[in-house]
Structures are given as structure tokens and as C-alpha cells.
Amino acid sequence: MPRRQILSSEEQERLLVIPDDEIILTRMCFLNEQDIALINKHRRPANRLGFAVLLCYLRGPGFIPDKSNVPHSSVISRIASRLKLQPDLWPEYASREQTRWEHLTELYRYLKLSPFSRSLQKDCIRHLHPYAMRTDKGFMLAEEMLNWLHSNNVIFPSVDVIERTLAEAVTLADRAVFSALTAQLEKQHKSALDSLLKSEGEQASRLAWLLQPPGKINGKNVLQHIDRLNSIAALGLPDGITLSIHQNRLLKLAREGRKMSSRDLAKFTDVRRYATLVCVIQEAQATLTDEVIELHERILGTLFSRAKRTQAERLQLTGKLIQSKLKQYVTVGQALLHARESGEDPWAAIEDVLPWQEFINSLEETQFLSRKGNFDPLHLITEKYSTLRKYAPRMLSALQFIATPPAQTLSDALDTIRDMYRKQLRKVPPAAPTGFIPESWRKLVLTPSGIDRKYYEFCVMNELKGALRSGDIWVKGSRRYRNFDDYLIPAAEFEKSRHNDQLQLAVQTDCRAYLQARMTLLASRLEEVNAMALAGDLPDVDISDKGVKITPLENSVPSGASPFADLVYGMLPHPKITEILEEVDNWTGFTRHFAHLKNNNVRPKDGRLLLTTILADGINLGLTKMAESCPGATKSSLEGIQAWYIRDETYSAALAELVNAQKARPLAAFWGDGTTSSSDGQNFRVGSHGRYAGQVNLKYGQEPGVQIYTHISDQYSPFYAKVISRVRDSTHVLDGLLYHESDLEITEHYTDTAGFTEHVFALMHLLGFAFAPRIRDLHDKRLFIHGKAERYPGLQSVISTTSLNIKDIEAHWDEILRLAASIKQGTVTASLMIKKLASYPKQNGLAKALREIGRIERTLFMLDWFRDPGLRRRVQAGLNKGEARNALARAVFMHRLGEIRDRGLENQSYRASGLTLLTAAITLWNTVYIERAIESLKRKGIPINNQLVSHLSPLGWEHINLSGDYVWRNNIKLGSGKYRSLRTVDTELYKKQS
């Protein structure tokens, strides 16, 4: 049986490589006086150089250069310079094997190094075991192994020996994981797990049924999901069966199990099969729990939206009648006024303009029209009580809700409703909890005759939604609705990191010093902008008693930019999209990142099938239609590629490869240095099955859709994309900055109005990012200061009457640091925390304290916005790049009417990732050929204005064939280092125009 491969060939090459880093090379080549004395004992110059090189390698990186691993040229030249020798002596030394071994023996004694023996290998495997229990990624384990060898003064063995050691460590860890997951399983548990794999006739297996997505948003599907949860509970798996296993391992096993058919799972050895099924079931239970809650939230949202629409429709229908009644009562009122002034009989005056019986009828009609139900949609919500009643009893029975102290009253109300369902009570007990009921609900719920049951249930279930989002109530077994504290770094670990100054935050950890520095900066900036405002020196900004008026930026694009762009794009070849993908892969090798789910070193045998699958995602064609449009591809072969090679992490790594390649292009430096970026959401309509997964985001209208939130660098590379729900864009801004895998080092980020909240301002600052949103209603925003507004008369009209609450920050400083450190270290995602903070009631201390920091940072930003037109231009330019990229994405994502028709979030995510990868490939391809076009123009004597080059965009697509049959052609495949021919253009015409 072949040995398990742990490291890919690329990783093997990377493992023992000296980086081109001046500091590392300088440290490595340092020789002290004792070293020099030892080196000089050797007579021949070549021997002295060779001995010194071996010394530096053994003491530094820890391995020995040989014929297959030639020393770094900078190392040889530095050491030769230090010893006043010629660097070309190394080949002479390397040819003397016997001398080399004698020198190594001498160096082992001098450096007190030990060879890598079998006993040390066993010690190394024992050291690696806890790491291998957390991950089976070979390169991470290899780095840890080398660190252990170095710290124990052990000579690095060959890569082959390292690989064998890692393979043994990973295999032992695999067995330990399987054993730990199955140790508590009894015979009945194993029998129940095996029954999940069985199917009758054409029916799917029980396991396949458990893993089905929710489908349409209705009570029926909530009940089906609850049936699935109950089926999992009926398995009776021991509590905490997975607690001893690291989350990375659990997720990998669960992913493998979900991708495999029941028939393939049944072929596993018993211990591996049961371990895999346990992981799949535990993951499915958490997913089902979250999906039940999400279905409930969306059903409630639908019911409230429907009530609003019904109320609006009824109001519209009665509008004419209301208008006629108003006119009628104006007439009656005028008659009464006239009667009072003239002393006439008022009753007769009324009857003169309106017969008495008609007056009585009119009063009754008006009384009907003035019902609150005609103006407040809450009065109509109980018309759909049957929808809630259909699933609520079983949902409350199936899920275990646990409340924090602020939500205990609401938790008691849930118990009351659960008890009413169980006892089949018709009325709400008089002693039922009511303290949680908001003011807007109280008159509906608390009536003179007692508590209205329907409104009470609706109110409780609606308040539950908010409490779950904020974390005031959490759900046992959930992934998304856990206890808030469980998301954060453990308190003891946080204190240890803080004490050792390892929080990795961009601010001082001492609260007093931090606040003093920020208040000093704020006061200084206020004084500066106040003086400029009084003198009228703010560029294009006027601050008066009426507020702020900012003159829009003038178009700074040179008039020659458009003709120059036309000339350059006219020279670009006209490739098919398939040719672009293949050519970009030849340049970058991005497809090597699409590793097999079960073995990180396995790649698809047919690289073009992988590219075809990526293309199907990116152009929104789908696998079925792509198989019909691509000769040689079948639906089953594409599905196999998607099942085993397409994942979020493989897409992310491939995207990073393209972004890094773009960053390395000389032309990209004209557009930016890769330190600024922008982000924006793009809405795609949903159709077919996708309409069940689509959500309404009011920013894009009332129709459901799917939003893809994309981050793009100043070099036009989209470096992060994520499918987001109906929540505000700002929830996901930090995710792209923290979790992208490229080499970009973003320091400043731009968004539009939807991308900012004060919580985002605060966290951006704490994590070291300069945040610059383009705020549409900036004239309505206020500056927050600590002190009296009278000190700044030039800004008084835009200073808030509410002062900064510094005490809130001081009181919750430790919580703020712990939250920020947890996000920075990846313990929890930024988007999840921002979403929970936004859902907190106003009195929550942490949310309020973070808001105060956000107010400080937003005030500083607004002052910079007023005084610095350069900032305004940078933000505008950054957002323009994002909008241009969205236009390219819309053009690429053309099939199926541009609609997303996948109902599962996983497949929607693949669509977003494929689209982002495709636009990144087009951007890189355009950049390379624009460079070649410019070089060609230079050779023809055309003067190139660098300012015009900076205004070129690599986001054009008119020259690319995006439609038709998707054919991979062998006869026009380009060789290494070869490019397509540029097209001929009339440069004389351009000279005349310019």
C-alpha cells in the first residue's frame, strides 16, 4: 500500500527554503569571533567557505545544503565577504563529499547538535500528536516539527523523512479521533447509525432526508425540520460525544460525510463509519436548529410585512370615503359656527346641511373608519394566527431556550405558553409574565377583559426573535445562537494575553492612557477645524447655522483618458472566456488550490473539468446546462468535481493567488499600492427554487433577492466575497478585511452609507483600520464632543447636544478589549458579533460603550472629511472602482436572466465565489495585456502619459466572448512565456486626437 502523502510537491519545495529577507539573511550569516577562529583552522579557502556555510545553515534554519539543495546565493556572498574569500569557491567544496562529512561531524560537536534518530522521531511524533489532533494540514504540522527540532538542537532530516514522520503522526491522530468519537457508543447506538444509511427502493436514505435544506418558508417545513431534529434526538447519542475533538477535525469529517453517498459510507471500516456519522449528525443537528429559528424569523417577518400591506391596501380603499367624511364634518362644523354666531338652533342648523338619520349613519361609518386597525398593522397580525399556531407548540417543545438575567421574564413567558399548549388552555393565566411587553404592544395584549391570547403569543414570539439575535436568550445545540460569552476568548486566556501584551490590537490596553490620547487628538482636531470654519478656509465646505453644505467633487478625469482607453482596449485580443481562464491558470497555477476534500494533495486529473465547473458557477449557467454547452463534459463528471474539489476554502485560496498576481504586476502600482479598498453589496434577483432562499433587503426594494458583498482593492482586485442576508451591509465590512487570504495589507477602507454604524467605526479603530464611509446624509449627522459646544462657535450648529459618555467606556473597557481580541484572533467572526451588538436593547452596557468609541471615531472622521478634500477624492475613487467591478460582475453573471436559482446557501456561496474568481481572472488578464499594449505603443514612439495610465481600468469586457459553446481548444494553447498577438490600431488617428 503506498505511503500516505502529507505534503504536496510545492509544499516540499517551500519547506526548506531560505526567504529573500534582508534581516533574516543578516542574522543567519552572523559569525562571532569564536566561529571565525574555528573556521580559520581549516587551511584551504574552499574548505573555510564551505565550513562557514554549513555552520550558518545548521545554526540558523537547521538543515544542510547539498547537491540537490544549493545554498542561497546571498548567504554564500555574505559569508565570503565576511571571510574575504571568493563566493565561486562553493562548487569546489561541494564536490568533496568526504571533507563535507568530516566538517559536519566537527560542527555537530561544536553546536551540540543531535542527528534525527528513531527514538527522537518517536519523541517528535508524541510532540506533534496534540497538533495533529487539531488539524491534518501537512505544512502546518511540518512547520511545528521543524520548530521542535530546532528547539531541541536536532539536525533536520531530509524532506522524505519529514514526510514519513508527519504521515505517522497524522495516521495516529486519525485513529485517536475515530476512537474518541466512538468510545461511548453502545450497540444500540451503532445499530441506529447504520439504519440511517439504509434506503427502501427508490427512496433516499434516512441520512439524506436528515440533510435536506428547508425549502419554502412556511410552517410545514418548520415541522419537517423539527421531525428531523426529533429523529436525531431519538438516536440517543451520548451528550458531549464530540467535546474532546477539535472543531477543525469535526468539521472536516462532517464535510466528508455530507459529500459521500450512503452506499460509500457503508464501505468504511466500522470505527471510521461511526465516527464520520457522529460528526455528520452533530453538525446536522446544529444546522437544523439554526434553520428552524431562521424559518421562524422569516415567517414572522412575512406575517408582519403582509399585515403592513393589508393595512395600506385597506387605507387606500377607504381613502375616498375618509375624504368625503372630512368634507361632511367641515360642512357640519361651519353650520354650527354660523348657528352660534347668529343665535339659531344648532340642531336645526345640522339638519339644514345633513338629515339627522344620515348624520347618525355618518357617525357610525366614521367610527368604523377610525379603528386603530386601519392605521396600525399590529392590529391585523392576529388574522394569521393559525400560521403561528401550526408550528409554535412543537418548536417550543423541540428547542431548549436558556435566558440571561435581562431576558428572564421573556423566558418565563415562553414557559407559560409552552404550558398552555401542553395543558390545552384557552386563556392566558392572569399571573403570566408581562414585564417584557413593549409599549407598542401593551394595549393590544393587556385588555380590560384580561390578556389577549393571540396577541400575547405573537408578542412573545416576536420578542424571542430579538432576544435570540442579541444573545439574551440562547439555544442549546445551536451554532449561531450560542451563549454570548462562549464566542469570546476564555477570560483567563484573555487576561494572560493582556498581561503578556499579546492582544494584537491597534490601541493601548490601558483605558486611561487610551482615552487621554483620543480626547487630546479630538480636541486638537476640533480646534483646527473650528478655526478653519470661522475663517471660511474649509475647502468646498460651508458650515453655518443651517448646517453643513459640501460642494460635490468636480470630475478629475483628464479629457484624454477616454481616447487613450479606447486606443489601448482596441489593441487587446478578443478571447473566449475559456481561453482567459486557461491562460490565467498557466500564469498563476490557481487551480492547484482546489484540493480533494479527503486528501489535501490530490488534484483533479482533468484540469479542464475543474475550470468548467468554476465557469459554470461564475457565469451562472449551472452544471446541467454547462454539460450541454461544453463538449467532453458530463453532468456527473462536473458534479463529482464540485462535490470533492469545490469548497469555500479552495475558492478563497485560488482567489488569493490571483490577487497576489495582480499585486505583482507593474501596471497595478499606477492604480494603488494595495493598502486601500472598498466594499459594496450587489443584489441579484432570485428565481425558481431560489425564491425560497431569497430575502428582502429594503435597500434594493421589496422583492426578495440574494446579496453578494464584495471587497475590492485599489488595484481593482476583488479579494473577498460573501453571500449576505437582509442585514445591513455594515455587518460584513470587517469580515473581508480580516479573513481574506491574499498578501494585501489594507490600512484604509471605504464604503457607502449602508456600510457604516458606530459599532463598525469602533471595531475598525480597535483593529487598526482607517474607516472612511461616504455618508449620504452627512448634513444630518452630529459631532460628539467631551465638553461645552460654546468652545467651538464655528462648529456649534453641527455639534450634538448629547455629550460623549466616557464613563461607559471606562466601565466596560475590559469587555471591549476581550471582544476585539476575540475577533482579531478568529475566535468569532466580526459579522456575527456586530449583528448581535446591533440587536442588543439600548441599555446593554457593552453595546453602549462600543457606541461611544464609535462616536469618537466618527467625529474624528467627519472633521477630516470637512478639512481634507483629498480624503473625499480617495473615497470617491475607491467606491467608483467597486461600482465598475459590479458592472463587470453583472455582465459575467448573465445566464438564467441573471437570477440565482439555488435554494441552498452552500450553492449560492459557490455562485458568489465563482463569480468573484472569474472577475479577478478577467481583471488580471486585462492588466497583463494592457501592459503589453502600452509597451507596444512605447516601441512605436507614442508618448505615454502616466496620468492617463492611472485612469485606465482593467474591468472592460466588450472584447471578451462570454457566451456560446464553452470549448477548450488544444490547437491554440499558448506555450510557457508566450502571449496572444495584440490587435492593430490606427495610432496616427490617436496622435491627431491627442
Curated annotation (Swiss-Prot):
Protein's name in the database: Transposase for transposon Tn2501
Family that this chain belongs to: Belongs to the transposase 7 family.
Function statement: Required for transposition of transposon Tn2501.
Pfam hit, one: DDE_Tnp_Tn3
Keyword 4Fe-4S: no
Name of the gene: tnpA
One term of GO molecular function: transposase activity
Protein origin, superkingdom: Bacteria
GO annotation (BP), single: DNA transposition
Assigned keywords, A-Z: DNA recombination, DNA-binding, Transposable element, Transposition
